[in-house]
């Protein structure tokens, strides 16, 4: 999967990201990866579920879910652990 088929989840409303994922599929992508970390993880799950259950119900399924931890530096020089998630949605055959 190329980097162009990745949607990074941030603080915008959920429907903005849903539209981004749907646009990727309509432009011909076979797979779209939804990535988030920290507090945005729940928003990433919401995006995947809305795309899968409401908009592309019979066309898309969850292919893979990866979870992990990243060490991020803080302002005072220490590191903090932040959870990450990657949800890969794939078009059904």
Swiss-Prot record:
<dbReference type="GO" id="GO:0005694">
    <property type="term" value="C:chromosome"/>
</dbReference>
<dbReference type="GO" id="GO:0003723">
    <property type="term" value="F:RNA binding"/>
</dbReference>
<dbReference type="Pfam" id="PF01918">
    <property type="entry name" value="Alba"/>
</dbReference>
<dbReference type="InterPro" id="IPR036882">
    <property type="entry name" value="Alba-like_dom_sf"/>
</dbReference>
<dbReference type="GO" id="GO:0003690">
    <property type="term" value="F:double-stranded DNA binding"/>
</dbReference>
<dbReference type="InterPro" id="IPR002775">
    <property type="entry name" value="DNA/RNA-bd_Alba-like"/>
</dbReference>
<keyword id="KW-0963">Cytoplasm</keyword>
<comment type="similarity">
    <text>Belongs to the histone-like Alba family.</text>
</comment>
<dbReference type="InterPro" id="IPR013795">
    <property type="entry name" value="DNA/RNA-bd_Alba"/>
</dbReference>
<keyword id="KW-0007">Acetylation</keyword>
<keyword id="KW-0226">DNA condensation</keyword>
<dbReference type="GO" id="GO:0005737">
    <property type="term" value="C:cytoplasm"/>
</dbReference>
<protein>
    <recommendedName>
        <fullName>DNA/RNA-binding protein Alba</fullName>
    </recommendedName>
</protein>
<keyword id="KW-0158">Chromosome</keyword>
<keyword id="KW-0238">DNA-binding</keyword>
<dbReference type="GO" id="GO:0030261">
    <property type="term" value="P:chromosome condensation"/>
</dbReference>
<feature type="modified residue" description="N6-acetyllysine">
    <location>
        <position position="11"/>
    </location>
</feature>
<comment type="function">
    <text>Binds double-stranded DNA tightly but without sequence specificity. Involved in DNA compaction.</text>
</comment>
């Amino acid at each position: 999967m190329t980097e162009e088929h990745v949607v990074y989840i941030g603080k915008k409303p959920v429907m903005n990201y849903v539209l981004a994922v749907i646009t990727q599929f309509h432009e011909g992508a076979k797979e779209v990866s939804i990535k988030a970390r920290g507090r945005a993880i729940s928003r990433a799950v919401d995006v995947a579920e809305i795309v899968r259950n409401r908009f592309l119900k019979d066309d898309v399924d969850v292919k893979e879910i990866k979870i992990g931890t990243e060490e991020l530096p803080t302002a005072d020089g220490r590191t903090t652990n932040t959870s990450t998630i990657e949800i890969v949605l794939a078009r059904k055959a």
